[in-house]
Structure formats: structure tokens, C-alpha cells
């Protein structure tokens, strides 16, 4: 868990790369071989070479000019408050990269699409190095974003003492990066930069789970997988919520308070790519993960978290959470089409009347296997939900809590039940 994390992203990164580096089927001059691009160039007008080796002439291409117009139209739509038009232009602009990598497009080419992604990686890498030279630590990055902690490292400690407000000023940091990036692109590639890094948000606390089966900082985080507590007033639970934190396993303690009044802590928690926002996990798993995040962001002691987990599991085995055990998965083809293997939702669908064997299948794992909701004839398999829903989620928290699953759940997962 990290404190004070700033999130930066590039506005329309791939379209901006196409515009900046003149990436276009007509300007493409081949791959550089033996020091020269296969398509030739002139000494007066040296070509632009992408990190993947693709070379582009500087004569303006069609796609960059189209994107210039679309950027202008989108800016006009945003100025008018026309959210629909702005969204349409955004989708169209982002599709340019997709069609260049799609076989069905007559202008597609792996070198063109590869040039865009390689420039993206080069630019994100340059920004990461620049920020770290300033004393910040880049925790995580995806296609067009960087997550930066400002309260780490000796350089940051020195800056924190000298100018704490400036250290947390995302707009100021953006300005420094953009000015330096512009100089780098002009000096290195001789282009007119059209790339703009934006300050998106700040998290008071930020959780980056490790990869399943991995450990260590290098293996933390999955693509789009993280959770953060959006910046706001200091999060402290109210006495009433605190008293019921363990008594109601499903998250009764989401209410929090400050000296200014009461607010809902859970509304400030953003989750991306984790089980809490995935439909193929049960409500039991969703609420369990959100509650663990709340306790983590509130900096609750390990004993309190263990107590919450214990009461949750006891409630599960008492049958008090049966309404939260439903899986939901779409049936995308007929049951008879599943020949090699039969997934649980297909087995459940096979028990339904033929007229209902379609669309979203809601089912429960019972002691007799998966059964569709409304047609359940056997008790739920609580061991399944403990081992497949609760324990995998808890495993992501063991490193930050400096414990293990045995300590959280008891040996075998349910030691206290016997």
C-alpha cells in the first residue's frame, strides 16, 4: 500500500503519436537495413525512424492530417459541452491504430501498428526515467498512464521538506514533464510534438496487488489491476461503523466519518481489473474484496482483519450468505456445441427448461455440482466458495499484511469451525 499516489495519462496517446511522427501508409518508407530505410530518403529531409525500425518520410501523410482535423472538432465539441460528439471523435481517432493492425484493412501493416506501440513504450519509458530523476517513484504504468508515488526515495524526502505543496502539485509536475518531453522529441526526432501528459487524479492510498503466483515489486500489478482511495478528507470510521465492522461480514462498516461529518468511504474507492468489478465473481467475493480494501486503507490492525474474515466464514457456513453465492455467465452457444469440455454454467443451463437455455445463466455451486438459480435441490458447496472465492482474493493481501493464508483463515482454511 502506498500513500499519496498521483495518476498521469496522455490524452489520446496513439492518435497523438500518429500525428507527431507522421505515421501513415503513404509516408512509410520500409524498415531500416544497413543504415538506410528500404524506401529511400534524402539528405535534406532525413526520415523519422521508429523504435521498431520502421521509417517514415516527413512529407505529410493523410492519417495525421485527418487526425489534426478530428482533434480540432473534438476540442470544439468539448467547448460546447457536446459530450456525445466529443466521445464519437475520440472513438474514431482511437480506431486509427486498430485498423492499421487489422488484416481486413487494405492499408494495414504490422510495421505501422508496431511503430505506434513502440513509440508509446519509448515515450512512457522516457517519462518514467524523467520522473525518477526528479526523485519520484513510478509504481505502475499501462498503455498510456503512469502511477507515481511522491513520498518515496531520498530526493523526495528532501523536496518534501523544502516544498511539500509543490511536491503534490500534479499540474506543476505535468508542466515540467511536458516541457522536457517537447525538448526531447524536437532534439531527437526533429518533429513538432503533439503529445500532452495530463494530471488525472490523486489517491490518498493506493494498493497494487502482486501477480498471482508472483512476488516482489517487479511482479506487482496486473494490466489495469489496482485499487485506490481517491483524495479527500482523512478516512476514519465512525464509532457505530467501527463497532459493527466484524459483526456484519457483508460490509456494514462502509460508513466513515471525519470532523466535518459523515461520508461513505466506499464511494471513494476505485477498483480496476480486480475481482470486485468482474461479473464472473460472486457478490460474496465482490463485497469481501471491497471490505478488505476498506480495512487496508483505514490502516486497521491485522487482528481486526482476521476477526472480520473469521466471522465472514462462520456466517458463510451457517448459510447466512446464500443469496451472495450466485455466479453469472453468458451462454454464448447452444449446449450441444460444447463437446470437449462442459463449463459449470453450461452444466447448470442443461438443467433448465429448453426455452431458458440462453442468455445470462445464474447458478450456484452445490454439493451435487452447478445448479441454476430457482432450480436448486442441494445445499451449497461452502468449501468451494471458501477455496475458490475468498482465499484467492485474500492471497493478494497477504504480502502487504505481512502474513499468510494459514494465519488469516486457520490451517486448512476453516480450523476454527471444528
Identify the role of each PLM range.
Residues 58-105:
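Active-site cores of enzymes that catalyze phosphoryl transfer or operate on phosphate-rich substrates
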Amino acid at each position: 500500500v502506498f500513500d499519496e499516489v498521483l495518476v498521469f495519462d496522455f490524452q489520446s496517446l496513439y492518435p497523438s503519436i500518429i500525428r507527431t511522427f507522421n505515421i501513415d501508409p503513404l509516408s512509410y518508407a520500409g524498415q531500416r537495413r544497413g543504415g538506410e530505410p528500404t524506401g529511400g530518403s534524402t539528405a535534406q529531409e532525413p526520415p523519422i525512424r521508429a523504435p521498431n525500425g520502421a521509417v517514415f518520410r516527413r512529407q505529410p501523410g493523410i492519417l495525421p492530417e485527418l487526425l489534426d482535423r478530428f482533434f480540432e472538432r473534438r476540442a470544439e465539441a468539448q467547448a460546447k459541452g457536446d459530450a456525445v460528439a466529443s466521445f464519437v471523435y475520440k472513438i474514431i481517432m482511437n480506431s486509427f491504430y486498430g485498423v492499421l493492425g487489422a488484416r481486413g484493412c487494405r492499408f494495414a501493416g504490422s510495421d505501422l501498428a508496431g511503430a505506434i506501440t513502440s513509440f508509446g513504450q519509448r515515450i512512457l519509458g522516457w517519462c518514467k526515467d524523467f520522473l525518477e530523476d526528479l526523485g519520484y517513484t513510478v509504481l505502475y504504468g499501462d498503455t498510456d498512464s503512469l502511477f507515481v508515488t511522491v513520498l518515496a526515495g531520498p530526493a523526495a524526502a528532501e523536496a518534501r521538506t523544502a516544498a511539500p505543496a509543490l511536491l503534490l502539485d500534479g499540474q506543476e509536475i505535468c508542466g515540467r514533464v511536458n516541457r522536457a518531453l517537447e525538448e526531447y522529441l524536437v532534439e531527437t526526432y526533429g518533429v513538432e510534438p503533439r503529445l500532452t501528459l495530463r494530471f488525472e487524479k490523486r489517491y490518498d492510498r493506493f494498493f497494487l496487488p502482486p501477480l498471482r503466483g508472483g512476488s516482489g515489486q517487479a511482479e506487482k500489478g496486473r494490466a489495469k489491476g489496482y485499487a485506490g482511495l481517491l483524495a479527500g478528507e482523512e478516512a476514519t470510521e465512525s464509532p457505530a461503523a467501527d463497532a459493527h465492522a466484524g459483526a456484519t461480514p457483508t460490509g456494514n462498516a462502509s460508513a466513515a466519518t471525519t470532523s466535518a461529518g459523515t461520508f461513505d468511504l466506499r464511494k471513494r474507492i476505485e477498483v480496476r481489473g480486480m475481482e470486485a468489478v468482474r461479473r464472473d465473481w460472486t457478490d460474496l467475493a465482490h463485497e469481501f474484496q471491497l471490505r478488505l480494501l476498506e480495512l487496508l486503507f483505514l490502516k486497521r490492525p491485522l487482528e481486526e482483519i482476521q476477526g472480520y474474515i473469521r466471522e465472514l466464514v462462520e456466517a458463510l457456513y451457517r448459510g447466512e450468505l446464500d443469496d451472495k453465492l450466485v455466479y453469472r455467465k453468458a451462454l454464448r452457444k447452444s449446449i450441444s456445441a460444447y463437446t470437449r469440455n462442459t463449463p459449470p454454467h453450461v452444466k447448470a443451463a442443461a438443467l433448465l427448461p429448453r426455452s431458458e437455455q440462453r442468455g445470462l445463466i445464474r447458478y450456484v455451486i452445490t454439493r451435487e455440482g452447478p445448479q441454476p438459480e430457482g432450480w436448486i435441490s442441494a445445499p451449497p458447496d461452502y468449501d468451494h466458495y471458501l477455496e475458490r472465492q475468498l482465499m484467492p482474493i485474500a492471497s493478494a493481501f497477504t504480502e502487504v499484511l505481512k502474513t499468510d493464508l494459514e494465519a488469516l483463515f486457520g490451517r486448512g482454511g476453516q480450523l476454527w469451525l471444528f
